[in-house]
Design a protein with these regions (language model features):
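A short core secondary-structure module
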Residues: 183-187, 240-264
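Acidic/His- and Gly-rich active-site-bordering loop/insert found
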Residues: 26-135, 154-163, 342
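Acidic/histidine-rich, surface-exposed loop or edge segments in extracytoplasmic proteins
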Residues: 35-46, 231-234, 371-378
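Second-shell loop/turn segments in exported
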Residues: 42-51, 132-137, 216, 237-242, ...
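Bacterial N-terminal signal peptides
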Residues: 9-20
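Bacterial N-terminal signal peptides that target proteins for export
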Residues: 1-11
Length: 471
């Protein structure tokens, strides 16, 4: 997934750069080839219901082989029992065997998309009005295409990095309950992805409503997604003889209590750095509230100001929300069972059981059980913020967008970093792609990303990986 933060009003518009690089300003640097790669990825359906990640991986592997990569350095992997959920491993060997590799990581699976709901065909890459439209254009086939394109460009140039540059394209990031490719690699192919650190999705650059750049974010920590099942069982009976002890009533009251509960504010290195940095950029009441919360997380007035912004609210705490309901077995019978799924995004380092225990207290009804139906991935371990990571990001960002600050961030959602960080591979969300305040339809209808953002992100990530590879 990608960050869905938004900005409710213009922020220091006069002081920040407007998107100015033209669509074709950087000349012919293989852009047509990159666009063909991007198009092929978007137009390869990789939804769980009808798609094929293995096919997408095979197509990207073919591009690398065509660029001259030997079979030993390009491999499509297919986990047993999951023929359409395969992925790609590739590498450009480095010159120093003592230097640990860097890993370019991307998932190629996408959220479901129904043609009848979309204005355009979701599985056709369409350029219109300065945007690329299509499922996965933003989340995250643009970056996946950049990673493949990077390896092609490096090979074409004869670039010999000090560190080995590895690529992993995976499936399953968007499909809860199915196989996760990054998690599978961490468990079954750990050596193949071993790296000093990895770069993947997570957060983008922020634009305000007028298209002014606000900041380039770097993901250093993220929450863990965990579902909890609220369930009530009851003997039921005939609907003509209602009783107060109704499974649906118990469940509705429980869900209502959850909806009104706020978990306490927490700060870690990532969101502390974010609010400290953004307080100077945002200014005004919001900026003052950010600074106040950093100084005192218990400042209720400051927290109330930040909570008006959905993204800031989510960055400050664990959040839980009802996502599905199911109850009853017949329209003329008292319900024998009622269930609700509560999806929680758990603040880094907080145990799952601690959240379950708190939900039990909030529900405060012995008739309602609170269970963990499935554990998907370990608890997030934040990647350390170091000069070796942030320095090159700042250098390249200032080359492309002078004056735009680089700000560490905590992602309210979750990415495949949740599998690599606990496996000992610090993983950072760095895209170099600036996105609109409304999120660009990620996971929703008519997903889009600015054409300019894709091409600028391509340039940014190309330069950044080169710097990292020669550290």
């Amino acid at each position: 997934m990608r960050d869905l933060g938004y900005w409710s009003a213009p922020v220091l518009a006069a002081a920040l750069a407007v998107v100015t690089l033209a669509h074709g300003a950087s000349g012919d640097d293989g852009r047509a080839r990159f666009l063909a790669t991007y198009k092929e990825l978007v137009e390869t359906n990789t939804t769980l219901s009808a798609g094929d990640c293995t096919l997408a991986a095979q197509r990207m592997a073919a591009r690398l082989r065509q660029a001259g990569y030997p079979e030993a350095n390009v491999r499509v992997f297919v986990p047993e029992g999951h023929p359409k959920e395969g992925g790609l491993l590739a590498q450009l060997p480095g010159s120093d065997p003592q230097a640990k590799a860097i890993l370019m990581l991307a998932h190629v699976d996408v959220v479901e998309a129904r043609r009848e709901d979309w204005t355009r065909d979701p599985f056709t890459l369409i350029e219109e009005g300065g945007y690329f439209y299509g499922r996965g254009t933003s989340d995250m086939k643009a970056q996946a295409a950049v990673w493949v394109d990077n390896l092609v460009r490096f090979r074409e140039e004869g670039f010999r990095p000090r560190r080995t540059i590895k690529l992993a394209l995976t499936c399953g990031e968007e499909t809860n309950g199915s196989l996760n490719g990054a998690g599978w690699l961490a468990e079954h192919e750990r050596a193949a992805i071993d790296a000093q650190f990895a770069i993947t999705e997570g957060v983008d650059g922020d634009l305000d409503a007028q298209g002014h750049r606000i900041a380039l974010e770097v993901l250093a920590a993220e929450k863990v997604s965990q579902n909890y099942l609220l369930e009530v069982t009851n003997p039921g009976g005939h609907s003509s003889r209602p009783v107060p002890d109704n499974a649906i009533y118990h469940l509705v009251r429980a869900v209502d209590r959850v909806s009104h509960y706020e978990f306490p504010v927490q700060l870690d290195e990532a969101n502390r750095a974010y609010f400290s940095g953004m307080s100077k950029i945002v200014g005004g009441q919001d900026g003052a509230a950010m600074a106040a919360v950093v100084a005192n997380p218990a400042d209720a007035a400051a927290v109330a100001v930040l909570d008006k912004n959905q993204n800031w609210h989510a960055m400050l705490r664990t959040t839980c929300v009802a996502t599905t309901l199911a109850a009853g077995h017949a329209t003329n019978a008292l319900p024998q069972r009622a269930r609700a799924n509560i999806n929680c995004r758990i603040f880094p380092g907080v145990p799952r059981e601690a959240v379950r225990d708190q939900l039990v207290k909030v529900v405060a009804d012995a008739a309602v059980s609170v269970t963990v139906p499935e554990v998907r991935g370990p608890v997030a371990e934040p990647a350390p913020l170091t000069a070796a990571i942030l320095g090159p990001v700042t250098t390249v960002a200032h080359q492309l967008w002078p004056g735009v600050p680089v700000v560490p961030a905590l992602e309210p959602g979750a990415s495949d970093a949740q599998f690599l960080n606990p496996a000992g591979i610090p993983t950072y969300g760095i895209t170099g792609m600036f996105t609109d305040p409304d999120g660009g339809g990620i996971h929703g209808l008519n997903e889009r990303i600015r054409v300019q953002s894709v091409y600028e992100g391509r340039t940014f990530l190309y330069r950044l990986v080169k710097i990292y590879a020669n550290q």
